[in-house]
Amino acid sequence: MAPKKAKKRIEGGSSNVFSMFEQTQIQEFKEAFTIMDQNRDGFIDKNDLRDTFAALGRVNVKNEEIDEMIKEAPGPINFTVFLTMFGEKLKGADPEETILNAFKVFDPEGKGSLKADYVREMLTTQAERFSKEEIDQMFAAFPPDVTGNLDYKNLVHIITHGEEKD
């Protein structure tokens, strides 16, 4: 019995990170972790991060950038550590900032807009996929501009505040 208890303490630390989130949120984090754990060894490492960025279309990520991400963890990144890191980042996080950061992953130049076709592709093929109807509803409510770009900064503002920016 003692080895099991010791293992749990190592994995989970002294606080129960699982109590910070609802069960549905934990399941979503588990899906994200599984997507990022490219080699399916139960840990996210540098190669997993590089492969994840490549899958998202960012192939020229600097080693330093990946090293900085890995250094944020107190040790090997298993699911419990992953969940703890997100819990710490999201504690008191502004929902607008959280959603913006999700879009910024796809906008490394920081333009504030993305090609609508690219957004449609990402939302229908990655993680928790949107249906065609859901995408059509989103673009009906927030149509792209004449060049086919979606102003995601304005979209996020409307989602979180219910009104357009001035």
UniProtKB/Swiss-Prot annotation:
Changing S15A: Loss of cardiac myofibril assembly. Loss of phosphorylation. Loss of calcium sensitivity of force development. Increase of phosphorylation. Phosphorylation at Ser-14 and at Ser-19. Phosphorylation at Ser-19. The modification Phosphothreonine is found at T52. N-terminus is methylated by METTL11A/NTM1. GO terms for molecular function: actin monomer binding; calcium ion binding; structural constituent of muscle. Disruption phenotype: Myl2 homozygous die at 12.5 dpc, which is associated with ultrastructural defects in ventricular sarcomere assembly, that included disruptions and disorganization of the normal parallel alignment of the thick and thin filaments, narrower fiber widths and larger distances between Z disks and misalignment of Z-band between sarcomeres. GO terms for cellular component: A band; cardiac myofibril; myofibril; myosin complex. Abundantly expressed in both cardiac and slow skeletal muscle. In the adult heart, the phosphorylated form is highly expressed in epicardium and weakly in endocardium. Ca(2+) binds at D37, N39, D41, D48. The keyword Zinc does not apply. The modification N,N,N-trimethylalanine is found at A2. Myosin is a hexamer of 2 heavy chains and 4 light chains. Interacts with MYOC. This chain binds calcium. PANTHER family: MYOSIN REGULATORY LIGHT CHAIN 2. Contractile protein that plays a role in heart development and function. Following phosphorylation, plays a role in cross-bridge cycling kinetics and cardiac muscle contraction by increasing myosin lever arm stiffness and promoting myosin head diffusion; as a consequence of the increase in maximum contraction force and calcium sensitivity of contraction force. This is Myosin regulatory light chain 2, ventricular/cardiac muscle isoform. It comes from Mus musculus.
